[in-house]
Amino acid sequence: MNRLIFLFSAVVVLFAACKTETIFIDSSLPNGTFSAAKSGTLVEQNGTGTAGMVELGTDEDDVQFLRFGSNFTTNLGTGTVTVYLSTSENFVADPANGNPDLRQVGPISKTGESYFKLDPTAAAKFTHVILWCGSANIPFGNAALN
Amino acid sequence: MKNTGLLLAFVFFVSGLTAQSGWTREPGQGYVKAGVQGFASDQYYNLAGDLLTTSQFRQQAVSLYGEYGIGKRLTVIAAFPLLKVNSFETTEAVAGIGDLRAELKYAILKGSFPVALSVAPELPTGSRNNYSQNKTTSFERINLPTGDGELNVWTTLAASHSFYPFPAYVSVYGSFNYRTGFNGSAFRNQVKAGAEIGYQIKGKLWVNGRLGAQKTLGQPGTPVDFIRGDGTEYTSLGFGAAYSITKKLSLTLEYQNYLDLIFARKNLYTGHIFSAGISYEWKRAE
C-alpha cells in the first residue's frame, strides 16, 4: 500500500513539475505595436454611412496588416461587405486574367477597429481600399492610401 | 411596405398596384383580387439619384387584395402579399410573406363627387431580415427582406368623379406615410400624390392610366437604412386593364414603370413591373 501511495505521489509531483502556462497568440492580430506606413480616410458611396480611417502597416514581427480604425462605420445590415485592395478607387474586376487590379482581403463583420493580416505582403501597386457588396455589385466606400 | 410600387427601394418589393379613389363600398358589397407580379432590373438609382448598373435584382410576388363595405360610409380594405421571392442574379432566391396593409376608409362625401379619407397601418408581418447566399462566394450573402420591419401608417385623402353616362372616371389623391423605424434606425416620413383616369370600352373592358409621385421628408440619418426604403423617391406611370368575364368575375393586367417627371428617382430599382390577376366583385353579402 505504501508503495502505491509513493508511486501516486511521484506521478503528481512529476506532472506538477511539467505543468507550463499556456499562452494563446491570435495570429490574426498584430504582435506588439502596429506601425502604419500608409493611411487614408474612407469616402462613403451610395448612402451606406461608410466612414473612418484605414491604415496599412506592420507589427513588431514585420507582418503586414490592414487596420480599420475605431471610428470605422458602414451599413452592415445589408449583408456581407467585403474589403479589397485596389489599384484605383474603382472596382475593376477581370477574373479571366486573375483580377490584376484587385486583391480580396476578406469580409468585414463589425464596425470599429478591425485588423486583416496580409500574407503575402500586399504589392505596392495597391493604392486604395474598397468596400464592396459582391452580390449587388455596388461599392460602399473607398479610401486612398497615402 | 411603404411604396405602392416597389416596396423597399433597394430590396424592393412589388406590392399591389392598387389605386386610391373617393368611392367606398355599400354595406355588404365586396371585391377581392388575387394577383401575381414580376419584376427584374439591374438599374438602381442610389440615394443621391445617381444611376448604377448592378447585378440584376428579381422579384416575383403573389398577393391578395380585398374591399368590403361594413357601413354606409365605412369600407375595410386589406392588401396582403402572400409570397415574395427575392434574388439577385448572383444569389440564391429567398422567400417570405410581405407586410399586411389593413385600411379603414371613410366616405366624407358621396354622390357624383365622392371624397374619402382612409387610414392604413402596415404591419411588419414580413421577414425583416432574409439573407440570400451568393452563388459563387461562400462568405457572401445579402439581406433581401420581404418586410421592412416597421409599423407605418398611410393616411390618404382621395376624390373621384364619374362622367356617367359617358363611361369614364377620374380620381386624385394625396397620402402621408408616417414611418417609425427598425432596429434603431428612424425612417423618414413620405408624401405621395397621384391621379388616375379610366375609360370603359364596349361595356366589357376597363382601361386606365395612372401617374403618381413620392417624396421623402426630412434630412437623412447616418447611415440611411436604404434597404428598407428610407429615402425612396420617384414618379410612377402605370396602365391597367380589367376585362369582365362575367358580371362578377374579371381578369386584370397592369403595367408600371418609373420616371423622373415630378420627383426624380432615388433609392429605387427601376424597370418594368407586370402584374396579372383575377377579381371577383359582389353587390351584397352572398
Task: List the predicted regions and their residue ranges.
Chain B
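Residues on the lipid-exposed face of transmembrane beta-strands in outer-membrane beta-barrel proteins
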Residues: A34-V36, L64-Y68, A78, A102-Y106, ...
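Outer-membrane pore/translocation modules
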Residues: A93-A186
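Residues that define the transmembrane beta-barrel architecture of outer-membrane proteins
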Residues: R58-V62, V94-L100, G147-V153, F187-A193, ...
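Transmembrane beta-barrel strands of outer-membrane/channel proteins
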Residues: V32-G38, A78-L82, L117-L123, V172-F176, ...
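Repeated loop/turn-to-beta-strand initiation elements of outer-membrane beta-barrel proteins
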Residues: R73-A78, S112-V115, P165-V170, K204-V207, ...
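Sequence/structural signature of outer-membrane beta-barrel proteins
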Residues: F39-Q43, K84-E89, E122-R128, R141-I142, ...
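Outer-membrane beta-barrel biogenesis signature
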Residues: G16-L47, T53-T54, T155, K283-E286
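Outer membrane beta-barrel transmembrane domains
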Residues: Y45, K192, E196-E286
